[in-house]
């Protein structure tokens, strides 16, 4: 791809920028290094790690397309070189609140550890919904989440977790529609490493009414910098 100045990537990102306000690039660590498996092999045992394009690609994209509204998925185990690439790129990484409560150890996903330059999610397409997670996660994890976030049935567990996202220092918060609607695991988008039944959920017009819109609007205003003037 470098030989043609990353033509495919340039066209792809350019097209996405026309369709969406923000583009998210998943599997960011692959731009630092990736595991290459021979196409003819049936298993991954003969694969080898290879260097990714690194900043060379992102420098070319910026030169051709200018500054782009990009979020990068930097979840999971990150090597020092991946962290350096993220810093050098200037793109915001992701924080998923659900990931914060897997253990009692201090986690980078706990809101008090967020840097400002990041994007916080209650969950992604690969997570259960908040309400589903509250029912299926280990009891100690749920208890930790309730204590840390002061989650209550009265407020709604989903609204409590959204409150945590909005009130964090993260530059941006993104909430899946299923969490906004308070839906359970039946509305989950995807279960990784499974086939069938994924990517089928759709919101309907009947689920989104003025009452919900007004509540969301108030919450968004509450956590803006000029909230006092708006409320």
Which sequence ranges carry the predicted segments?
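Alpha-amylase-like alpha-glycosidases and glucanotransferases acting on alpha-linked glucans and related
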Residues: 1-174, 178-185, 191-206
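C-terminal accessory segments of extracellular proteins
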Residues: 216-222
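Conserved small/polar residues in nucleotide/adenosyl-binding loops
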Residues: 223-231
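A short acidic/small-residue loop/turn micro-motif
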Residues: 209-210
């Amino acid at each position: 791809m470098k030989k043609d100045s990353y033509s495919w990537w340039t066209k792809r990102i350019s097209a996405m920028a026309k369709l969406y306000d923000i583009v998210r690039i998943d599997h960011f660590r692959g731009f630092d290094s990736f595991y290459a498996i021979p196409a003819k092999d049936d298993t991954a045992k003969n694969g080898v790690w290879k260097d990714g394009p690194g900043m060379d690609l992102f420098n070319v994209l910026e030169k051709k397309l200018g500054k782009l509204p990009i979020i990068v998925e930097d979840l999971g185990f990150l090597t020092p070189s991946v962290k350096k690439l993220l810093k050098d790129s200037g793109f915001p990484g992701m924080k998923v609140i659900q990931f914060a409560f897997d253990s009692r150890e201090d986690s980078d996903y706990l809101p008090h550890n967020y840097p400002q330059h990041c994007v916080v999610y209650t969950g992604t397409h690969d997570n259960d919904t908040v309400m589903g997670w509250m029912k299926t996660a280990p009891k100690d994890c749920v208890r930790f989440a309730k204590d840390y976030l002061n989650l209550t049935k009265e407020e709604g567990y989903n609204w409590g977790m959204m409150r945590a996202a909005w009130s964090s220092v993260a530059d941006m918060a993104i909430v899946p529609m299923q969490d906004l609607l308070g839906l359970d695991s039946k509305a989950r988008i995807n279960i990784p490493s499974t086939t069938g039944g994924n990517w089928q959920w759709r919101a309907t017009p009947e689920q989104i009414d003025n009452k919900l819109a007004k509540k969301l609007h108030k919450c968004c205003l509450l956590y803006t910098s000029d909230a006092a003037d708006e409320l």
